[in-house]
Amino acid sequence: MTKSLYGKTADGKDVFSFTIKNESGAEIELLNYGATLNKISVPDRNGDFADVLVGFDTMEGQLSCTDSQGRTVGRVANRISGNGITIAGKNYRITKNIDG
């Protein structure tokens, strides 16, 4: 596994990428920004490697993305209080966590 600086958030915090590669050369890239899966590179039938995931090459791309693309932890992770949420005028009850 390799770790490298990917970029910075809007408030200046470092974002790192973690690349994991297997023996055949396939690799994934993860970011510590929303637990983002940013890249999956696998071989095609001819053995040529290609990234098969729609991701971003820069932190600016990540910051401009408004739909949490690739993120396993969305924008409201650990931030819903009162065990409910309203979407498009409809109230939804959710299971209350330990602290929330």
Regions found by a protein language model. Name each.
Residues 1-100:
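Surface-exposed acidic/polar loop and edge beta-strand patches at domain peripheries
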